[in-house]
């Protein structure tokens, strides 16, 4: 079974169109002003229109205020909120209650210790996303184009729904899927020519690589 595929940090209609044509299950818009992938909520709403009913629209936020979330949810009408900050389990529950939307909680990973917090969110977050921990000095919590040791996720069983992120690209996504059997994958910098500049050709190459990697898994029934 092919994993869910999320193309994140979209900013142009061409990139959205190609992601949808290639079968992206999720498209992500980033509302963190320090990111080169930042987009205004009203523009994101226009770009998201062709995706409605075809792919889940994900709003990516980092420790947002209620006012910021109000504006994003009102304009974009996302299918899911991706929380990429330091939101506590209690705060996640509050956000879910306020907006009636499922939440994907992000964990930044470098060592096994970074995963100890996950258990507190099981049954609270609807899905997890595991990304590489940002290098020292980086202002960006994600989208840094670096990977982590995927074997750290070996303790996860089928009851934990998650997406794998962090430096995925056409050259390493097959190995990532082989090691983790991740039910979902998330790519941003791996389909760019420069930070925030999505490449239609690179989106194609990424999907081609996933489909090639998935073929033997389908044949073996994995």
From Swiss-Prot:
It holds the Pfam family PRAI. It catalyses: N-(5-phospho-beta-D-ribosyl)anthranilate = 1-(2-carboxyphenylamino)-1-deoxy-D-ribulose 5-phosphate. Keywords: Amino-acid biosynthesis, Aromatic amino acid biosynthesis, Isomerase, Tryptophan biosynthesis. Transmembrane segments: none annotated. It is an enzyme of class 5 (isomerase). Its EC number is 5.3.1.24. One of its GO terms (molecular function) is phosphoribosylanthranilate isomerase activity. Pathway: Amino-acid biosynthesis; L-tryptophan biosynthesis; L-tryptophan from chorismate: step 3/5. One of its GO terms (biological process) is L-tryptophan biosynthetic process. Coiled coil: none annotated. PANTHER family: N-(5'-PHOSPHORIBOSYL)ANTHRANILATE ISOMERASE. Belongs to the TrpF family. This is N-(5'-phosphoribosyl)anthranilate isomerase. It comes from Rhizobium johnstonii (strain DSM 114642 / LMG 32736 / 3841) (Rhizobium leguminosarum bv. viciae).
